[in-house]
Amino acid sequence: MGQAGSKGLLTPLECILKNFSDFKKRAGDYGEDVDSFALRKLCELEWPTFGVGWPKEGTLDFKVVAAVRNIVFGNPGHPDQVIYITVWTDITIERPKYLKSCGCKPHRTSKVLLASQKVNPRRPVLPSAPESPPRIRRAQFLDERPLSPAPAPPPPYPEVSAIVEDTREGQQPDSTVMTSPPHTRSGLEFGAQGPSGMYPLRETGERDMTGRPMRTYVPFTTSDLYNWKNQNPSSFSQAPDQVISLLESVFYTHQPTWDDCQQLLRTLFTTEERERVRTESRREVRNDQGVQVTDEREIEAQFPATRPDWVGS
């Protein structure tokens, strides 16, 4: 995988650099800017040194991509590389059409097809991770007032088994269950049961100067996003009620930040749906009197299109 084996075929890195405008746009959706030279340097010189099997020509093998992402988001981590591996992960998951045009076929052990089991169909839900990426980790000082009880959990979703697609014609898919990306909130394998109630806002055991409990914020992980995406395979246009119900639950339990919302937009909505959400949301901005705002500067202040300066402060 990843080798330009015949004339006209490009490696994953070459293909992504050839279509770097897409990479740059995806980064822009997170409010970040990227550089093609920096991406090439990371792919050819930095990530191969992580010891997880990353080839210098790049790869679309999700296991390897997730392993690199785990290191980048780890402790101490590589904050300057976060946006690059995040967008690379998005491309690995979404597989835009230009990958096929470049001849970048899915890795035999990386393209996962989720198939419902005939017996006891319930989807596994991955637990939360105990650590957070250093890039956007911060302490939040909250009131000592107890949180309202969480809403009743939704009905169990069908269980899925991760079936590895065999791209070799005539062979049966490998039915072994793929382990989860390394950066899960508990380090357990995919499908393993973990402790419940692991929410992003977690008490640290310390208190601030006023005596209020100090909590640490933990952003979404790849596992969180995969679970939510797999639980709602239909697009927002096809099943808006399902997606809205999921978002209501996520906002209630996770209190997502601006960065988290960008992750949710990219995971649960198509490009067209994202643009529609942004457009309609800006139309719904109201002032303190409940009157619709038309001043673009005020709209931008309340509904920023790019990552605001106060994020992560």
Curated annotation (Swiss-Prot):
GO terms for biological process: viral budding via host ESCRT complex. Residues 113-135, 167-197, 280-313 are annotated as: Disordered. A motif (PPXY motif) lies at residues 154-157. GO terms for molecular function: RNA binding; structural constituent of virion. Keywords: Capsid protein, Host cell membrane, Host membrane, Host-virus interaction, Lipoprotein, Membrane, Myristate, RNA-binding, Viral budding, Viral budding via the host ESCRT complexes, Viral matrix protein, Viral nucleoprotein, Viral release from host cell, Virion. Pfam families: Gag_MA (PF01140), Gag_p30 (PF02093). InterPro entries: G_retro_matrix, G_retro_matrix_sf, Gag_P30, Retrov_capsid_N, Retroviral_Gag-Pol_poly, Retrovr_matrix. GO terms for cellular component: host cell plasma membrane; membrane; viral nucleocapsid. A motif (PTAP/PSAP motif) lies at residues 127-130. A lipid is attached at G2 (N-myristoyl glycine). Residues 172-183 have a biased composition (Polar residues). This is Gag polyprotein. It comes from Avian spleen necrosis virus.
